[in-house]
Amino acid sequence: MRTATLYRYSVPMEAGVILRHQRLKSRDGLLVKLQQGELSGWGEIAPLPEFSQETLDQAQVAAECWLQHWVSGVESDDSVLPSVAFGLSCAQAELKQTLPLSADYRKAPLCTGDPDELFAVLQALPGEKVAKVKVGLYEAVRDGMIVNVLLEALPDLTLRLDANRSWSRAKADGFAKYVNPALRSRIAFLEEPCKTRAESREFAQDTGIAIAWDESVREADFQVEAEPGVAAIVIKPTLVGSLARCQQLVQQAHQAGLVAVISSSIESSLGLTQLARLAAWLTPVTVPGLDTLDLMQAQVVRPWPDSPLPLITTEQLGVVWHR
């Protein structure tokens, strides 16, 4: 016999979490639990405002429709809504015990704020020093100076940078001008520096700073292929779709000689632990981009190892659908 439950969560965010144009005060999403006999599987459906094509309400309607079929014994195709496809595929994989349990809890720390504080955090990193710095929120020249200072001060540091398509070509060049050419090879990649793919490609070839595709991966005309100056693709499953789709993208990236990075869309601790398992399975040699839990004030259902944040249990969540 099959049963399914859909829970809704809302977790307060730390002050100052800004997406593209708005402050994110709470992270809201759905957790799905599939039960079949003694086995169960969980998944998270949490569209990210400003980044997902679907709203949470739209995702809930689609999830309820899929679950209604599933409980009745009908196997439906993956939802066309990426967050729904991802969450439901995780729940099914757990139920069928096909999502490996081993997880990669390494995370490239997400660095924001004062360079002196960053320096202390980065210096204390154990093992491979890989960190992520958001650029494009302030002046491009300032970003270039900070990146240069960090790379100069920490010779074993590699940086991943993310500009979210925020720069014109001129601003991107302004950033590059302040990064010593001798240090640029330690920028693993800069995600989508410019507003268009063509400008980003030209920037990479002109500056020697490698780029990665992020937003582009979710666009209909995107193809994974080897290109001069392109080092990686960033895969955000909540925005991309099912586990099968993520697996396909990783395989295509590796065949093209590109790095594939599994990355968070600010999921709850439950979703993050599943992303850590996905990363250990599909991209075992690459540090995933999962350092977003500290943006929240609580964990949900499953804890992240060693996190001091309080845990919201199933009993504390609202049930929005059950059959």
From Swiss-Prot:
Mg(2+) binds at residues 162, 191, 214. Its EC number is 4.2.1.113. The active site is at 134 (proton donor), 236 (proton acceptor). InterPro entries: Enolase-like_C_sf, Enolase-like_N, Enolase_C-like, Mandelate_racemase_C, OSB_synthase_MenC1, OSBS_N. It is an enzyme of class 4 (lyase). Converts 2-succinyl-6-hydroxy-2,4-cyclohexadiene-1-carboxylate (SHCHC) to 2-succinylbenzoate (OSB). This is o-succinylbenzoate synthase. It comes from Yersinia pestis. The gene is menC.
